[in-house]
A protein has these predicted regions:
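Hydrophobic alpha-helical segments
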Residues: 1-29, 604-636
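Extracellular/lumenal glycan-associated context and N-glycosylation machinery
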Residues: 26-606
Length: 636
């Protein structure tokens, strides 16, 4: 019974949660979630106007690590508001302090907060900065981290130094990438060896240039211990690809040396350079891809469509692709580079194949599946039209200092022609959100302090989230109906505040709707309940008892008999029934005015009363449900 009470309060508060249906977005009508209904009450009171107040009372235990000072929540369907407050005193004082505020509006989601927590003893210095902007005219991001780690942490004993450099540049027709990683471990064991491979393409075909200086072990000595054996091995290993694709390969052994090994594990050292020239493999690749896709039961493509995919893949131009490694005596170096043109067609081919994937018998794709691929194609078209270029960078280093180890990490994101790209998307009916994020953290004495904020804004942000739920579920499914009801309920605002200080944790949350009854009515249909509470109030002002009141408006007549009351589903054999006029007890109501004040909304007009913008982040009102659930969980 207690678990059912927990479930129904949680569900009732979820009525006020903007993403109530997301968790079950893939549920079908037959396998949909089971919607909880009010459990059997401890007592039931009939009011003079025929309402029935269900009362649930339970002794509670103090939560681990603290005592409850205040825990109360309320939901008023008629007023369209939900509010919760939870305050816990911790038995052992925490040195961590922080404040976080979150707000969700129909067109905006935002957050800010600050935190201070004791620094680890091994951290001698620390700073972190992150900034992100995506607006109508620009999109960029920067991240930097610097930290000094005391030698007592033992990091320097494994890594003496390290350097990392990476850049990826993605344009409408060309993609380039370069990167390298080098590090020294301080361990000198191991044979020095290196390998490098570079592929280039021209009108005649592909060329592979390779160099290897590495140990050879007993199981493969016969493949490499003579020049002719090495040439035959290279032809077999690298020329077979051309044969498979109906082309030809020509191998040239530029240099060759096989000598005694420098360690006791290897049987020889190979030092070789060779070139492999491939011709006629593009057509073979295109034909093999087309044949495989057209004959596969996994993909629903005609022969013509499969051939188009194969041609698009073959049209990709590899100007250069290379990788190299060098290790030995504790030093390690790795690098790569790529320069590819006409990749757009191959990317579109990839999405075409994904879109054609067949579903197993008895399953179906969500309604938005094809629409998602159409949006991808439109995005690629917009990138082509605008010439938008994105550049990603990632650099870092590890070095040793007198006091220990210094670590740095930097990441960046930049765009070119972003404004034209957004306009090209807008011309295709795609509206991108604007967003801004900042985060700063550093070492302040013996503490790490941090401050941050994030804001995301888009017209009909919440409505778009709900439409994504309905579009990814079956028409008429429970989740789809609930998501649609949520949109019809006229969501106004959700807010959450969390603070930790002086050994106390406080969480407050709230949400408001213009017509919550719309959502409650659909939930009642889905759950099959005779009736749902019009209000729910929970109170716990100590750590040893809690009470929840659920009011069923107009459930019976004012002169109802006990038999009439016991006919209600939540009134069981053990429920104590008190008819109108038989008791002297009052029941708490939801403090609606306080809830609206907390949300900074004028109760009569439903307009914003806050000064300036409210910070916020995430689906804030979900914490209203969390507060109610946590409150009742102590009954367990």
């Amino acid at each position: 019974v207690r678990s059912r009470l927990l479930a129904v309060v949680f569900a009732a508060l979820l009525i006020a949660t903007p993403m109530a249906g997301v968790a079950g977005a893939q549920e079908s009508q037959e396998d949909g979630p089971e919607w909880p209904t009010p459990p059997e009450a401890d007592s039931a009171y009939v009011t003079d106007d025929g309402d029935v107040v269900l009362v649930y009372e339970q002794e509670t235990e103090s939560p681990t690590g603290g005592t409850v000072e205040t825990a109360n929540f309320g939901l008023d369907v008629g007023e369209g508001v939900a509010h919760a407050l939870f305050v816990q005193n911790m038995t052992s004082a925490s040195e961590t302090t922080g404040e976080f505020t979150t707000v969700l509006d129909p067109d905006r989601i935002a957050a800010n907060g600050s935190l201070a927590t004791p620094s680890p003893d091994a951290l001698s210095s620390f700073s972190l900065n992150a900034d992100l902007v995506q607006s109508d005219t620009e999109a960029n991001a920067d991240f930097s981290l610097e930290a000094g780690i005391d030698e007592s942490a033992g990091v320097g004993g494994f890594v003496e130094s390290a350097d990392l450099e990476n850049e990826l540049r993605v344009g409408p027709d060309r993609l380039t990438a370069d990167g390298q990683l080098s590090f020294s471990t301080g361990f000198g064991a191991g044979t020095e060896q290196s390998q490098s491979f570079t592929v280039t393409e021209d009108d005649s075909g592909y060329t592979l240039d390779a160099a290897q200086n590495r140990p050879v072990y007993s199981y493969s000595v016969d493949n490499w211990n003579t020049r002719s054996a090495a040439e035959q091995t290279i032809t077999q290993n690298y020329g077979s690809l051309a044969t498979q694709l109906g082309g030809e390969a020509s191998v040239t052994l530029e240099s060759y040396s096989f000598s005694n090994a420098t360690d006791s594990y290897a049987d020889g050292m190979l030092d070789v350079e060779f070139t492999v020239e491939y011709t006629g493999i593009d057509d073979g690749l295109s034909e093999q891809v087309a044949t495989m896709l057209a004959s596969s039961e996994q993909y629903d493509l005609t022969q013509s469509e499969a051939e188009t995919v194969g041609e698009q893949i073959a049209e990709m131009q590899i100007n250069e692709a290379s990788v190299s490694t060098s290790t030995g005596d504790g030093a390690n170096e790795y690098s790569y580079s790529a320069d590819v043109e006409n990749y757009d067609g191959a990317l579109r081919a990839y999405y075409t194949v994904l879109q054609s994937a067949s579903m197993p018998a008895g399953t179906s794709l969500p309604a938005s599946y094809n629409a998602s691929f159409e949006r991808i194609q439109q995005t690629l078209d917009a990138q082509q039209e605008s010439g938008m270029v994105q550049t990603f960078t990632l650099d870092g280093s590890v070095s040793q200092a007198d006091s220990g180890t210094d670590v740095t990490l930097n990441a960046g994101y930049e765009t070119e022609n972003w404004e034209a790209y957004r306009q090209a998307l807008a011309d295709r009916g795609i509206d991108l959100a604007t967003s801004e994020m900042t985060l700063q953290a550093g070492l302040d004495g013996d503490e790490i302090t941090a401050d941050g904020s994030v804001t995301v804004q888009q017209d009909e942000l919440v409505s778009n989230m709900l439409r994504s739920v309905t579009s990814t579920t079956e028409n008429g499914s429970d989740v789809s109906r609930l998501a649609q009801a949520f949109e019809d309920a006229g969501f106004q605002r959700a807010r959450t505040d969390i603070s930790v200080s002086d050994g106390q944790v406080q969480m407050e949350a709230g949400a408001s709707f213009r017509n919550m009854q719309q959502l409650a009515s659909v939930y009642q249909e889905l759950s099959g309940a005779e009736s749902l509470p019009s209000t729910i109030v929970g109170e716990q002002n100590s750590s040893d008892s809690s009470t929840v009141y659920m009011r069923l408006s107009g459930a019976v007549s004012a002169d109802a008999t006990e038999e009439d009351v016991r006919a209600l589903e939540p009134v069981g054999e053990d429920t104590e029934v008190s008819l109108a006029g038989e008791y002297d007890r009052t029941f708490p109501s939801v403090d609606v005015e306080n809830a609206y004040d907390y949300l900074n909304i004028d109760r009569s007009t439903g307009t914003d009363t806050s000064e300036g913008s409210q910070p916020g982040f995430g689906v804030a009102v979900a914490l209203v449900a969390l507060a109610g659930a946590a409150f009742l969980a102590r009954r367990e």
